A protein has these predicted regions:
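Conserved ATP phosphate-binding architecture of protein kinases
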Residues: 170-176
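N-terminal accessory/targeting segments that precede structured cores
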Residues: 24-170, 196-221
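Conserved catalytic-loop position in the HRD/HxD motif
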Residues: 321-323
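Helix-rich C-lobe and terminal helical cap/extension of kinase-like folds
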Residues: 31-33, 37, 55, 59, ...
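Hydrophobic residue at the +6 position relative to the catalytic HRD Asp in the kinase catalytic loop
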Residues: 325-329
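ATP-binding glycine-rich loop module of kinase domains
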Residues: 177-234
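Conserved structural core of kinase catalytic domains
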Residues: 223, 229-243, 247-249, 260-294
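A short, contiguous, amphipathic alpha-helix enriched in charged residues
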Residues: 125-159, 242-254, 291-310
């Protein structure tokens, strides 16, 4: 379990009518599931939790008895076998078994080093590469419907072996009739219905967990799940991903060193898109960035920071999933970003506040940093403002005099 930050006093977090509230959310969960016919999926999720050592959490949520009455007998002895594994491994294995929605959730958590220690991040990062691809025959009916013909007829060449696979879609290489090398990104058949059902469950489970497990309240599980649900639903639209890519490409054009794949709209739909194939050094292969290969790591770092700051602070529209698999390094010390299924947006006010926070870091103004953070979090119960300000001052000391970019 992730330790609370020192400035959050869990004991001070109120538990208003906790039991009645938990009972309400539990009842709403079951009633909603019965209506949506999702009870079987709930039993599957909780069964996986039990097998991976989280049976106590199921009991504390008050769902074990209900499942047994519904005919699902939880096999508690299995939990002991997997309980010998480290908690991060248990969670990662559970997410993998639960399928695409939960794999995607874990992939997002891989970028939250502010919430999880390195041992957790290392396990979540494995989720980026542990998604099995579907055979091409499982994709053909959907492809014929979206492209109007077999992919071998639409393209001059189509590779039936996948180049990459992710939780929502998989990618195949192809060649247009004019010789352009492209990738064809294909949404997994049936994935939209699966994700929609899982999100209904997650929303209700988050509400129940927040009511029944007060130590989770500072982490705002309901808000986290709602934001995840909105983002994931948008990511299902592969044409929407391409619109995001074109917008960010236009914003990045003045820099001259950022590459965004071109979109081929004639073959792009909600369930399939076609973009330029990017041939470069993957973001995970830093050892390949040598002077002999024509790369300057310092320059790449500066350009990457410049691009990210421009997206966030100046443009207010940014790539929200920039893990190493979505970044490539190109000749001429250029940087390519791919996969714009997840983007973030910041209002002008938020951008101004973020700039205030960054300037507070480099100009050694801990009070300015604290003011922004407290404004963002609101008047949260249990926050020890004095201790928070002390820790921020110690943190700001590390960056005193460091250039912003």
């Amino acid at each position: 379990e992730q330790a609370n930050p020192g400035w959050v006093n869990a004991a001070a977090v109120p538990e208003p009518t906790q039991r009645p509230l938990a009972h309400y959310h539990r009842r709403m969960l079951i009633e909603t599931l019965d209506t949506a016919r999702d009870l079987g999926r709930l039993k599957e999720i909780l069964g996986v939790m039990v097998r991976h050592g989280f049976g106590d959490t199921v009991r504390r949520l008050g769902l074990a008895d209900r499942l047994e009455r519904a005919g699902q007998v939880l096999n508690w002895p299995h939990a002991a076998e997997l309980a010998r594994l480290e908690p991060p491994v248990q969670v990662r294995l559970a997410l993998e078994e639960l399928g695409p929605t939960f794999v995607k959730f874990g992939q997002i958590l891989a970028g939250r080093a502010d919430l999880f220690g390195p041992e957790w991040i290392a396990e979540f990062e494995k989720l980026h590469s542990h998604v099995p691809a579907l055979p091409i025959d499982a994709l053909r009916p959907q492809l014929r419907e979206d492209l109007g013909d077999e992919p071998e007829a639409v393209f001059a060449w189509f590779d039936t072996a996948p180049l990459a696979a992710a939780s929502i879609a998989q990618v195949h290489r192809a060649r247009l009739h004019d010789g352009t090398e492209v990738i064809v990104k294909i949404r997994r058949p049936g994935i939209a219905d699966t994700i929609e059902a899982d999100l209904r469950l997650l929303v209700r489970l988050a509400a129940l967990a927040e009511a029944e497990l007060p130590t989770l309240k500072p982490y705002r599980p309901q808000q986290l799940v709602r934001e995840f649900a909105r983002s994931l639903k948008r990511e299902l639209d592969l044409a929407g991903e391409c619109r995001h890519a074109e917008r960010i490409a236009a914003n990045m054009a003045p820099l001259g060193f950022i590459a965004i794949p071109k979109v081929y709209w004639a073959h792009t739909r909600e369930r399939v898109n076609v973009q330029d194939f990017i041939d470069g050094v993957p973001g995970s292969d830093l050892e390949a960035l040598t002077p002999e290969a024509g790369f300057e790591r310092t320059l790449l770092a500066q350009r990457g920071a410049h691009a990210v700051l421009k997206m966030i602070v100046e443009d207010g529209v940014f790539h929200a999933d920039p893990h190493p698999g979505n970044v490539f390094y190109l000749p001429g010390n250029r940087i390519a970003f791919i996969d714009f299924g997840m983007i973030g947006r910041l209002s002008q006010r938020r951008r101004d506040e973020l700039l205030q926070l960054l300037l507070g870091l480099v100009e050694h103004q801990p009070q300015a940093v604290a003011d922004v953070l407290l404004d963002w979090t609101g008047d949260e119960p249990g926050v020890q403002i004095g201790q928070l300000e002390t820790e921020i001052e110690a943190f700001v000391d590390q960056y005193h005099g460091v250039p912003l970019a």
